[in-house]
Amino acid sequence: MIRRPPRSTLDRSSAASDVYKRQHEALPSCKVEVLIPDFMGLVEPLATVLTAEPDVLNHNIESTRTIFRLVRPKGNYDQSLELMVNSKRLAPSIPTKSGIIVGMGEDISEVIETMRDLRAVDCDLLTIGQYLRPSQQHIRMDRFYTPAEFEFLRGEGVSMGFKHVASGPLVRSSYHADEQHRSATLQPR
């Protein structure tokens, strides 16, 4: 997984695209998943990244609509969904992936609604992990989800049509990325 520079450095999207292309050239068998910001809603930097033809395009929505501004004050929930729409419009064969972090104050029905929103924009792959407060400056953790709840969310995601759902307390964006990629490419589009 290659993480793209943050949203404050949008002018670097072509440089990042060059890195992805060089990675493909140097190691053609190595799969490249790119983790990108929302590009503040701009399509041009997304298009630039997609010209490198990454194997998976990942943009983490991170939270539910109800607490989105608390979690990502500079982001926009609908803008994140629109990024997925634009990705599929510009490069329909590139699998898309997103991630949700739980335990920040949402309830499980809101997580399911976020999953539905992601499927509605044809997101292929999903990760769901437990929020762990990294410092006192970050939002408080509301609660730990149980293993049964993570399994329930995984099952819901599979029934919604996600090609792969990784759901568990330690799951993060890069969690078994190779398995997720295989799941996305083995199934007919």
Which residues make up each language-model segment?
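Short, ordered loop/turn segments at secondary-structure junctions
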Residues: 37, 61-64, 130-131, 170
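Auxiliary Fe-S-binding modules of radical SAM enzymes
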Residues: 22-29, 51-52, 75-95, 100-189
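Internal alpha/beta domain cores that form substrate/cofactor-binding pockets in large enzymes
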Residues: 33-37, 66-78, 90-91
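Short, surface-exposed acidic/glycine-rich loop or hinge patches that mediate macromolecular interfaces
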Residues: 37-40, 105
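Single conserved hydrophobic/aromatic residue that forms the stacking wall/gate
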Residues: 1-16, 20
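Alpha/beta enzyme core
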Residues: 26, 30, 43-58, 62-69, ...
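Structural motif corresponding to alpha-helix initiation and N-cap regions
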Residues: 42-43, 108
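A short, flexible beta-alpha/helix-coil linker loop
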Residues: 3-4, 64-66, 133-135
